[in-house]
Amino acid sequence: MFDEYSVKALLEAGADVNLKTTEENTALGEILGYMKDNYFDFNKIPLIEELLKLLLKSGLKINDTIDKKGNTAFIKACESINRNKLSNGKTLAAVVAKFLLKENCDANSTNLDGQTALMFLCASHGGEAQDLQIQVLEAGADIEAMDKNGETPLMYAARNRNLNIGKEMAELLFDFGDPKLEHVNNEGKSALEIATDLNNEEFVKFLLTKM
């Protein structure tokens, strides 16, 4: 997989780097598809970065959607950040996400469900997700964004399965502004009520200090 020479040959022959399949997938989406590959290893990361640079040089539209759900590559990478961690804790998704951020991708793009990259990161766990959350917030991610269910990044953090990381994600949101603590979703529940329902005591205690 990841045949750099073939990619170069195709691009030199005039291949459309933004061409989509019937499933709305693109070349960039195919790279992200290897997140399911259990044989992907750390040594291939430099090759991935070179391929991404090649695609970008050939006119890659980094903010284009890559699937029928309306996800951009950046959203998809952040949504998949926990998959197939390498022995050093790195993930292919994080490699792609960080590359796209460096190239000034739209940190506030939404999919068809109104979800942003920040929302997915707030629901994720592990050091890579936390590191990316900081970078996304520094890139101007909207901490008040709402998905089609009226859920905010703070609510995604409240649902984080790793209770400690969820709380840390919430703390970062408050560091960057007002994540709408009093807001309720389409079911009439606030982040505080969601955390209470999930018996997330530390998260509840933290939110109470912000009221």
Where are these regions (language model features)?
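Ankyrin repeat domain, specifically the short helix-to-loop turn at the C-terminus of the second helix
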Residues: 8-16, 52-61, 98-106, 134-142, ...
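Ankyrin-repeat-protein effector appendages
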Residues: 186-189, 194-211
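Threonine-centered tandem repeat motifs in low-complexity domains
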Residues: 26, 72, 116-119, 152-155
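Ankyrin repeat A-helix N-terminal signature
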Residues: 1-3, 30-47, 76-93, 120-129, ...
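Eukaryotic tandem repeat interaction scaffolds
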Residues: 79, 90-94, 106-139, 148-150
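Intrinsically disordered, low-complexity regulatory segments in ankyrin-centric signaling systems
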Residues: 8, 25, 29-39, 43, ...
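Ankyrin repeat boundary/linker residues
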Residues: 21, 66-67, 111, 147, ...
